Structures are given as C-alpha cells and as structure tokens.
Amino acid sequence: EAREAQTNPAKENNFRRYRLNQWGQQVTRWMPLHVWDLGLHPEHSPITEEPLRGRACFGGLDLAAVSDMTAWMLVFPCDEDDQAIDVLFRCWVPEAQLTNPRNKNRHLYEQWVRDGLLRITPGTTIDYSHIKAAILADCQMFDVQTLAIDRLFQGQQLGQELADELGTGPDGQPRVVAMGMGYLSFASPMKAVEKLTLEGRIHHGGNGLLRWQVEHVVTRIDPAGNAKPDKERSSEKIDAFVSLVMAVDQWTRHPSGPVESAYENRGVAFLSY
C-alpha cells in the first residue's frame, strides 16, 4: 500500500488517513509528471484547432481578478475512445506582466507568447473583452455544448454577457453554467480528472504551459475527504488546470459523458429486510 501511495495521489490520501491517522485538512502534490505524460500520444500531438472544427466539446473558464492569468479550456470527447478527451485551451495575461520585474515567471511568459501558447491583452489588467471575443469565436468554430464559469465576482458580468449571447442548447438548458469554487463543486470532477490522467486518457499534446501548471497543483483535502486544486505559492499558476477540471465537470454531467462505476462517487448501498 505504501508503494502504491507514492505514485497514486488518491491512494496516498487514503493511506495517510487510514494507515497514518493523519486526519484534518491535508495538502499533497496532485500528480507526478511522468503520470501526466501518459496522455502524450503521437497521434494526438500537438493538439490543433482544425481537426477539432465542428466537434462537440465542453468548456471551463477560470477568470483572473485583475492582473493574473485567465484560462479557457475546451475538452473534446474522442471519436475513437469516448472515455478519453482531447484538450485545447487558451491562456491570457496582461501585456505588462511580461516586463514586470516582480513577475518571476516573465521569461517563461515571453517564451510561451513566442510559441503561441500564451496570449496577451493590452495594458496592466486583464481585458475581459478579448476573452469574450475569443470564446464567442470558439463557439462558432466548435460545437460547445456547455461551459462552466466561476460564479463568484470575477465571473458575474462576463458570465451574464456570454449567457445572453449563447442562450440555450438543444435541450433547452443554459449553455453557460455558474460553478462554485469550493470542495463540493470540485470533489467529483477532480476524481474524474485523476482517473483520466492515470489511464492516459487526457490527450494534451505535451503542451508546455499546461504541464508547467500541472507540476504546481496540490490537492487540498477537507475533513470529509473532498479534494480541490490549490497551489503552494502565489508565483505558481494553476489556472489552466482549474479550467480543465471545470470543463470535465460539464462533460461528466452530459449524457455523452464518461461511464463510471456506481461505486466511485455514490459508495455502497445497504438493503434492510
């Protein structure tokens, strides 16, 4: 069990609780990078827009409050394996972050901008109009079923504008869904993302920006065993990973979402006679 706990974060948390009696709120590293790299498949690398055009997908938007990074993630169920996903995402930072001497990551940002992995908005704070335009363009290019957006203050105005523009889907339900950022909202999709990662079913194309963020993800566990993503230092960014969890949450709620065991999230039912 101890050996398995070293490579599997879910088993590590259980091992700490039930074998080492380490209860309460725990913080552990989410996933070893060599496990994340299981999703790097030659036939899915790199992930580009054109092969995904017109395909059904689900979105997650993690918005920056002022000058931080904003991430917009799309997950596409694979045609050849409906339990796997191709992921495509956009990240933005204000242009001033590339020259801000207090930004420890500015050299990485410059490289990612050159590589086309990171977009900039003019000025010192994030410009939501650029994000809105990009999302609406993606909704024209791809068949975005639903998208999740932070229901807290960062998402209220933009979320309403997107909801007005995108309206409802074929099922009559809103295409823009407000999502909480707490343990209860993240517990189930975190399990789903973990399972997909361990099975090598998140096809990420080896994207360097996303991999850098995955390296910084820790899981914060509440006393009830619910997990949500977090980071240890402010200079570490996990926005793209958070948006991935949000997008996967939308996918798992859809009829075409992944099949899961009845025991994974619901536990065991007891019958009395």
Residue spans for each PLM region:
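A short acidic (Asp/Glu
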Residues: 68-73, 155-164, 187-191
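Acidic two-metal-ion nuclease catalytic site recognized across multiple nuclease folds
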Residues: 248-273
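Acidic, metal-coordinating catalytic cores used for nucleic-acid/nucleotide bond scission
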Residues: 148-157, 182-186
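Non-catalytic, compositionally simple segments
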Residues: 1-58, 67-69, 85-130
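Acidic, metal-ligating active-site segments
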Residues: 66-80, 238-240, 246-247
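Flexible, glycine/threonine-enriched loop-and-boundary segments that flank and lead into catalytic domains
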Residues: 27-61, 140-145, 149, 157-165, ...
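Short, surface-exposed connector motifs at secondary-structure boundaries
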Residues: 138-146, 171-176
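Metal-dependent DNA phosphodiester-chemistry modules and their immediately adjacent helices/loops
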Residues: 104-116, 165-257
